[in-house]
């Protein structure tokens, strides 16, 4: 049961990090004026 909980936490963390990374990487394409971050 503990292993299942750890696996669930890992999957949720991966999804959250992927969502945040995708949002940050697609942000400069939506705002062309903020190219200084690249």
Curated annotation (Swiss-Prot):
Keywords annotated in UniProt? Formylation, Membrane, Photosynthesis, Photosystem II, Reaction center, Thylakoid, Transmembrane, Transmembrane helix
Cellular component (GO) terms are: photosystem II reaction center; plasma membrane-derived thylakoid membrane; plasma membrane-derived thylakoid photosystem II
Topology class, membrane:
Single-pass membrane protein
Q: Where are the transmembrane segments?
A: 3-25
Q: What happens when the gene is disrupted?
A: Loss of about 25% of PSII activity, cells are slightly more photosensitive. Altered assembly of PSII, with destabilized binding of CP43 (psbC).
Top-level taxon in the UniProt lineage = Bacteria
Indicate the secretion signal residues. none
Q: Which residues carry this modification: N-formylmethionine?
A: 1
Localization annotation: Cellular thylakoid membrane
- Location, primary (coarse class): membrane
What is one GO biological process annotated to this record? photosynthesis
User: Which Pfam families does this entry report, sorted A to Z?
Assistant: PsbI (PF02532)
So what family is this one in? Belongs to the PsbI family.
Q: What does this protein do?
A: One of the components of the core complex of photosystem II (PSII). Not essential for assembly, it probably binds to D1 early in the assembly of PSII and stabilizes binding of CP43 (psbC) to the reaction center. PSII is a light-driven water:plastoquinone oxidoreductase that uses light energy to abstract electrons from H(2)O, generating O(2) and a proton gradient subsequently used for ATP formation. It consists of a core antenna complex that captures photons, and an electron transfer chain that converts photonic excitation into a charge separation.
Its quaternary organisation is:
PSII is composed of 1 copy each of membrane proteins PsbA, PsbB, PsbC, PsbD, PsbE, PsbF, PsbH, PsbI, PsbJ, PsbK, PsbL, PsbM, PsbT, PsbX, PsbY, PsbZ, Psb30/Ycf12, peripheral proteins PsbO, CyanoQ (PsbQ), PsbU, PsbV and a large number of cofactors. It forms dimeric complexes.
- Name of the protein this chain belongs to: Photosystem II reaction center protein I
């Amino acid at each position: 049961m503990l292993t299942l909980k750890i696996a669930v936490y890992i999957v949720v963390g991966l999804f959250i990090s992927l969502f945040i990374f995708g949002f940050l990487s697609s942000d400069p394409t939506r705002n062309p004026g903020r190219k200084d971050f690249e």
